[in-house]
């Protein structure tokens, strides 16, 4: 029942996501005016705007001008619905230790915050994937806004850390620390509580952005042209804000792999040349979706292979 509810909720958000995809790259408001047919300009009636159902009943055509309605609309709605259901299944059907975003503390807070973070990230990634593919634009309202949301969720997560994760650790005997109880000792100071979680995630955002900026600079120095835009840098930083540094690197790996395979297919078919541009952000979004649900499992499998 919960999966069905999540799926239908995802359909509703997918319908709104279609509005964002159509308007944000043009700099238009997503609130007004009302949605209209891009061909004839007729306003879309509320009963013609029901996710999936209206498209099927209208047989994929505008009620007024009979022009075809793009397949993108039902596909985005369906993808968002499936994503919402997949997140609920992954988070609520598995142990918290196997989640893509791991927390401890109150179990209900763990599940709710993890679910919320993943559905928001998936919503943003699906939208950015389509927008970059169609327009080569990654709007700041999604990327920078996503970074802000991800960091806000991390700060909220810090409120629900378990008691064993809110400690101060001393080691190596380099500095002196006096505790409120009057005990004096020497050592390095390590935070394992809220400070570690929050500053660790901020560091992940900065690290991911700097890494892609470095790759961008090296590519420009070697090829004498830009290989990726700053939007891709902000996109990877957004993924890191939600998932952390290593899942973001995993996203970069899968995104690069997918882009390389797609580019090789285009070259083999003669549909592109070496200098052709690819919507790398779209492939990075695919990598982000994979890392969101399976990132920790894949990283743990890789570590196990190295042992």
Q: Model-predicted segments: where are they?
A:
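C-terminal ends of transmembrane helices
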Residues: 18-24, 59-69, 125-135, 212-225, ...
């Amino acid at each position: 029942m919960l999966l069905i509810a999540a799926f239908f909720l995802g359909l509703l958000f997918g319908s709104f996501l279609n509005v964002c995809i159509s308007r944000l790259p043009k700099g238009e408001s997503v609130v007004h005016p009302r949605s209209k047919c891009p061909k004839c300009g007729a306003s879309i009636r509320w009963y013609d705007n029901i996710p999936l159902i209206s498209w099927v009943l209208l047989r994929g055509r505008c009620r007024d001008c009979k022009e075809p309605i793009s397949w993108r609309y039902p596909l985005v709605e369906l993808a968002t619905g499936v994503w919402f259901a997949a997140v609920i299944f992954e988070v609520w059907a598995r142990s918290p230790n196997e989640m893509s975003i791991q927390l401890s503390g109150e179990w209900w807070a763990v599940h709710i915050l993890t679910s919320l973070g993943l559905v928001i990230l998936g919503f943003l990634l699906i939208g950015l994937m389509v927008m970059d593919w169609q327009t080569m634009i990654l709007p700041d309202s999604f990327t920078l806004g996503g970074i802000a949301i991800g960091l806000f969720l991390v700060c909220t997560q810090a409120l629900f850390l378990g008691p064993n994760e809110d400690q101060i650790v001393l080691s190596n005997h380099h500095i002196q620390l006096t505790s409120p109880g009057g005990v004096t000792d020497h050592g390095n100071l390590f935070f394992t509580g809220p400070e570690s979680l929050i500053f660790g995630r901020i560091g992940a955002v900065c690290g991911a952005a700097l890494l892609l900026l470095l790759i961008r600079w090296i590519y420009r120095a070697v090829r004498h042209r830009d290989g990726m835009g700053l939007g891709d840098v902000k996109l990877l930083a957004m993924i890191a804000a939600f998932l952390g540094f290593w899942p973001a690197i995993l996203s970069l790996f899968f995104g690069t792999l997918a882009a390389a395979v797609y580019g090789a297919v285009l070259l083999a078919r003669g549909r592109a040349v070496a200098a052709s541009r690819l919507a790398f952000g779209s492939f990075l979004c695919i990598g982000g979706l994979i890392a969101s649900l399976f990132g920790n499992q894949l990283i743990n499998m890789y570590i196990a292979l190295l042992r």
